[in-house]
Swiss-Prot record:
The gene is nirF. It is found in: Cytoplasm. Gene3D superfamilies: C-terminal (heme d1) domain of cytochrome cd1-nitrite reductase (2.140.10.20). It comes from Stutzerimonas stutzeri (Pseudomonas stutzeri). This is Protein NirF. Required for the biosynthesis of heme d1 of nitrite reductase. Could have a dehydrogenase activity yielding sirohydrochlorin from precorrin-2 or dehydrogenation of propionate side chain C17.
Amino acid sequence: MIRPFLLLAAVGLLTACAQQPLRGTGDLGVVVERATGSLQIIESSNQSQIARIEGLGDLSHASVVFSRDQRYAYVFGRDGGLTKVDLLRHRIDRRVIQGGNSIGGAISQDGTLIAVGNYEPGGVKVFDAKTLELVADIPATPLADGSRNARVVGVIDVPGRRFIYSLFDTDETWLLDFSQGNEPQITRFEGIGRQPYDALLTPEGRYYIAGLFGEDGMAKIDLWHPERGVERILDGYGRGEQKLPVYKMPHLEGWTVAGNQTFVPAVGQHRVLVMDSQNWQQTAAIDVAGQPIFVMARPDARQIWVNFAHPDNHRVQVIDSETHEIIADLEPGPAVLHMEFTARGDQLWLSVRDGEEIQVWDPYTLKLLKRLPAHSPSGIFFSSRAHETGL
C-alpha cells in the first residue's frame, strides 16, 4: 500500500508543478500605474507583461524596493500605504497604512528592515520585511511653533544596517544605526543647509549628498567618517541669481556616475552639469533640450540618457559620456516620466504617461523594440535593484 501511495503523491506533485511552472525572478520588474493605483509585473527576457496587481492606493509619487531574493516588491504609496507584492504569485502579500503622506523608503543591507519616510506624521517608521510589523517609530524634530513634525525626505539605505535621511523643515540629516539590534542609535547633523529636498548615495555607499531647495549648493556627509560632520559642496548648483521657474525638481537619484565623472541635472536650467567625482568640482556644462529630470548612465557608462520637465517632456536626449556631445534626440511620446536600464544594459525601458504606454529601446542601436500598453505609467523598477545600495 505504501508504494502506490508514494507513486500517487509523486504524480500529484508533478501535476502541480506542471500547473505552476518554476521560474526565476532576476528578469522581473514592475511598472507603477499611477492613475489606477495598480502595478504591472513585467519581464525583460521576452519584453512582456505578466500580470496587473490592483488595490495599491495612491501611487502618484510611488517608489519601489525589492527583497534580496528578488521575489517581493515593496511599494511606498503617497497615501502612507506600504504594500508587499509577491512577484511570483501575482498578488498582494501584505499591506499596511503606516502614515498619512509618505514620500518613499528603503530596505536595509541585510534585507530584514523596511524604512518609510513620512511627510505626515513627520518621521520614519521601520518595519519587519517579512511580516510588515512595526519595529521602530522615530518622530522627526517638531517645528518651532509645535504645529507638526518636520517632513522627511531622501530616505536611503547605507552599509552596516543603517538608514539616512533629511528633514526638509528643520535643515537636518539623521543617521539611524540598527547594527546592534532593533533599537537604533541616532546621529543628528544640524544646520546642513536650507530645505534639503532629496538625496543620493554614491555607488560605493560612502557619500550621502543632499540637495537644497532653499539655497544653492549641496550638503555632503562622509559615512566612513561621520564624525567630520557636513561639508558644503557645489556652491553653484541650484537656481542661481536668475531664479528661473522650476517646473519639476530633478531627482537626485537621477544623478549618474560614469568613470571619474558625475553627470548632474541642473535646477531650472537647460543644462546637464559634469563634476569631477573625486573633488566634486564642476568641469563642464552640456546644453540640453529642457530642464532635465533624470540623468541616467547606461551600465557600461558610455551613454547618458536624459528626460525633461514640461513642456519638453516628450523628448529624450542621449549624450556621449566621453565627448559630451548629444548623439541622439528622441521623441518617444507625451510625458516621458521615467527610464530604467536592465541590469546589464541591453535594454532601456521608459514610461510615456500621456501616451498610455511603456516603450522598450535598444540603447546601442537607438531603435524602438516594443510598445506595451499601460494606465498612466510612471516609475519602472527592475528587481536587479535588490543588489544595489542606495536604490
